[in-house]
Amino acid sequence: MHNKILILGNGFDLDLGLKSRYRDFMFSSTWKEKKRPASILSCNLLKYLEEKNEIEAWFDAESELLNYALKITQGTYWSLQKTDRDGHEFFQAMLKKYLLKEQEEFIPNNDSIAAKLMEAVIQNGFFDEIFTFNYTDLNKTLAKFRLNTRINTTYMHGSLEDSDNIILGIETDEAIHKDYQFLFKTNSRFYRYNSLIESMESADEIIFFGHSINGMDFPYFKDFFIKQSKSTAELKRKYITIFTYDDSSDQQIINNFREAGVNLRDLMQRNNMTFIETKYLREREKFELKKWNDLLIHLKDDSKDTQNNNLRRLSSMLT
């Protein structure tokens, strides 16, 4: 085995110690003390988002963007507003400003499971690619832990780089008023999708850390998991590890699979699939510790096999 990918969600940044929830941003001084341009002072989209400031997860915030767009389309909410596009751009700009500051100032969590996993990944050269749904710079956040990765990293929803934009939007098959189609993630030139699908299909091993596999991002994964649960001659058995927070988040992912038509029993039988709950791992619960240690041993053994195969290949080229 040699093709491994790592997929990161906001739970990864939270585990590192960043305050990167939707609620963290909405109650931050960056947002609360903002100076809103006169052109969007009466923007209904921003008013709607502020009413939802108790939401924690970003996938819930994106669901509210979809609800807003549907209500406008169906004529059951505020009337169509030309300032909503500008308000959406302003919201993204302020979020980027907040995260840039948080990225620089956050206090690293010394008990971070995410950092321990990345240390193992870096030291053993486990992974070929990283796909992150976070906006933060992976190298800059890991630098707080004196870690540096040169693994090829794809920022699925844009990044905090000056040359990049962040993407906060929707995915839906439902009809949306044409004036609100700016909310579609696929309309952004920074949207990156195809490379993830191709990498997941060709990978031997996939690790998810802190991704809810839920909400607006679920279409990325739905077809993949359905395919992996079916018995076909072309099916490649994969090692799939999902790091989630606790029983509740674990169950939420399982429920998402069921609702999407994924046969969980077949998925488990036809793949080496493991859930690791970081809350109980941090509490050193024996069952989670065993799964964690088994994963590290497996990755190290597999890394050695790959290195040995590479050495044999090089040797054969010289003889």
Where are these regions (language model features)?
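Conserved catalytic-core helix/loop/strand module for nucleotide-ribose chemistry
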Residues: 1-5, 10-205, 211-319
